[in-house]
UniProtKB/Swiss-Prot annotation:
Originating organism: Homo sapiens (Human)
Subunit record text: Core subunit of respiratory chain NADH dehydrogenase (Complex I) which is composed of 45 different subunits. Component of the iron-sulfur (IP) fragment of the enzyme. Interacts with NDUFAF3. Interacts with NDUFAF7. Interacts with CERS2.
Compartments in which it is found: Mitochondrion inner membrane
Cofactor(s) this protein requires: [4Fe-4S] cluster
Keyword Ligase in record: no
Residues found modified as N6-acetyllysine: K62
Disulfide bridge partners, by residue number: none
Transit peptide: 1-33
Disease with which this protein is associated in UniProt: Mitochondrial complex I deficiency, nuclear type 6: A form of mitochondrial complex I deficiency, the most common biochemical signature of mitochondrial disorders, a group of highly heterogeneous conditions characterized by defective oxidative phosphorylation, which collectively affects 1 in 5-10000 live births. Clinical disorders have variable severity, ranging from lethal neonatal disease to adult-onset neurodegenerative disorders. Leber-like hereditary optic neuropathy, autosomal recessive 2: An autosomal recessive form of Leber hereditary optic neuropathy, a mitochondrial disease resulting in bilateral painless loss of central vision due to selective degeneration of the retinal ganglion cells and their axons. LHONAR2 is characterized by subacute bilateral or asymmetrical visual loss, optic nerve pseudoedema and peripapillary telangiectasia in the early phase of the disease, and eventual partial recovery in some patients.
Encoding gene, per UniProt annotation: NDUFS2
Presence of keyword Repressor: no
Residues involved in [4Fe-4S] cluster binding: C326, C332, C347
Keyword tags: 4Fe-4S, Acetylation, Disease variant, Electron transport, Iron, Iron-sulfur, Leber hereditary optic neuropathy, Membrane, Metal-binding, Methylation, Mitochondrion, Mitochondrion inner membrane, NAD, Oxidoreductase, Primary mitochondrial disease, Respiratory chain, Transit peptide, Translocase, Transport, Ubiquinone
Name the record gives this protein: NADH dehydrogenase [ubiquinone] iron-sulfur protein 2, mitochondrial
Amino acid sequence: MAALRALCGFRGVAAQVLRPGAGVRLPIQPSRGVRQWQPDVEWAQQFGGAVMYPSKETAHWKPPPWNDVDPPKDTIVKNITLNFGPQHPAAHGVLRLVMELSGEMVRKCDPHIGLLHRGTEKLIEYKTYLQALPYFDRLDYVSMMCNEQAYSLAVEKLLNIRPPPRAQWIRVLFGEITRLLNHIMAVTTHALDLGAMTPFFWLFEEREKMFEFYERVSGARMHAAYIRPGGVHQDLPLGLMDDIYQFSKNFSLRLDELEELLTNNRIWRNRTIDIGVVTAEEALNYGFSGVMLRGSGIQWDLRKTQPYDVYDQVEFDVPVGSRGDCYDRYLCRVEEMRQSLRIIAQCLNKMPPGEIKVDDAKVSPPKRAEMKTSMESLIHHFKLYTEGYQVPPGATYTAIEAPKGEFGVYLVSDGSSRPYRCKIKAPGFAHLAGLDKMSKGHMLADVVAIIGTQDIVFGEVDR
């Protein structure tokens, strides 16, 4: 009303206002001492345009449904789709998970692999048997010599040769050093993913010492190419066995410190107990091996059930879990490190003298001293490293107990110097296939704990 008065140019004027389109007068309280204002016809006509009187043209016109609003529909609630990785620091490489979350609860976990695929199995078909060996270092690049050991045993089975005893003891010695390397990486990075940073720094100092043993024996810290078909590349340098003994004597103290930090830690137990539970039946159905199988209560270790090299001559125990959760698998790995120290001590005590390569000039390259005096040795050396040696036709599946599980090599020979087919069985591939089952129903943060306990390396998964 005040706006209407201001529009007419009057302030405080008592009047009766004619509502547009109707003959109803609205009384207005008159002010004292002011004459009453009456709106004229011209003023009232300016509001007449808003009223539409029915006519022939407008008889069939219907007003638009201004108030005919659709009723509200129920909102469709969908689960969140989350991409975990491949650049996530807890993905342990190039893992990509497409997860379906209900709040923070995992409903589905779909691993997408292949981001580190390099065509290793096909590349091996174009190399000689010796040239194919370095590819195995780059599969599981945390446990290098164990991969070499599996491939060398497969080639030796096709060639029907057996390396000398000293070479076999050296293989077992460095196989257990490699197991320590792998389990240090597995346990400490698992703890690092869950927020415990100290074990990572403590045990990586010990890991550095083992890399020095690698370097002294082969010249390389990681990709050693030391274990070869027919034996090992070269003998142990002087003083190395003494240094390994000193290391193994002190390493058990580092393991005690690790267990003081983690084993009875309330936070660590809450994050790992009853997380990622796998029953014994499920572990067998998924094809699990190694710690993933033993953590569920199945005592299966190829070093015991199908011993290779000289594992039948050493004494060690196989730790087994009971619940099949992340905590049991952690305890299994720590105890396996202690058993590896037992095996290392026996290797140092029982190391025999003798040759480190099979005495067959068609398979093993000659010594440098012989090459300088014998023309035949020089020819053998040249032929071995250019054309390679012919392997009799046949096929073999050879498996070893790698730190992550059963690492198998299916090797097919057609009688030439190059493999016809080399199929690699990686333990991490089967473990990753069970990630959906293990993580379903857990929180998003528990998926990190489950990935850590699986100990996955994508060099061997993607190949």
